[in-house]
Structures are given as structure tokens and as C-alpha cells.
Design a protein with these regions (language model features):
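Contiguous alpha-helical segments
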Residues: 1-53, 58-62, 66-103
Length: 103
């Protein structure tokens, strides 16, 4: 195992309680796409596409799925609050493409 692989495996274990093999299994099960938007990760750092983020419940630490950066940040901004997410959904449904309130 290279030092890069060791470091990656160590971080998965420390941060999420999973190893690299479990991450790869999740990645393959999800066919390499985000569990929410069903798109592959596109965000890059220094020209390299980053890995899908390991999404987890911040209260329990339980790993949920792999998400792209945008979806992971969105859940974070909503603090994983289902009611706030439902309100955001209602808000979007109640406004048409012209931005006029229709509800």
C-alpha cells in the first residue's frame, strides 16, 4: 500500500468508520454518481476531479451515501433539516420560471 493509499484509508477510517474498500464498493454500487442528483462529481482542485463526498449523519456518525460537492454542501446549508428542505421544495414549486408567485 502506497503512502497515499494509506493516508486515504486512514482518513476514511478516522472520519467515517469505513475503509477504502467500502468507499469503492459504495462508489460502484452508485455507479460513480451522486446519490441525489445522479451526476458524477465535476468539481476540480488543481485540475483534478475530486472524489464523491462521504455523506454522514453528523449526530450519529452513520454513513448514508456518496454525494457530489454541491449536493453535500446543500444538505449542510440546510443542516440536514427535513422540514427546511420541504419548505425549500414548496418555495420552488410555488414560483414559476418568471419568478411570479403562483401559490
Amino acid at each position: 500500500m502506497s503512502s497515499k493509499e494509506y493516508y486515504r484509508n486512514h482518513n476514511f477510517k478516522r472520519n467515517y468508520g469505513i475503509n477504502t474498500e467500502e468507499y469503492v464498493t459504495m462508489f460502484l454500487t452508485q455507479q460513480g454518481v451522486c446519490a441525489i442528483c445522479k451526476q458524477p462529481e465535476t468539481f476540480t482542485i488543481k485540475g483534478k476531479v475530486i472524489n464523491l463526498a462521504v455523506d454522514h449523519d453528523h449526530e450519529t456518525g452513520k454513513v448514508r451515501s456518496l454525494l457530489c460537492r454541491n449536493c453535500n454542501l446543500a444538505l449542510g446549508y440546510f443542516k440536514d433539516d427535513v422540514e427546511n428542505l420541504q419548505e425549500a421544495l414548496r418555495y420552488l414549486k410555488n414560483h414559476n420560471s418568471n419568478g411570479l408567485f403562483i401559490g
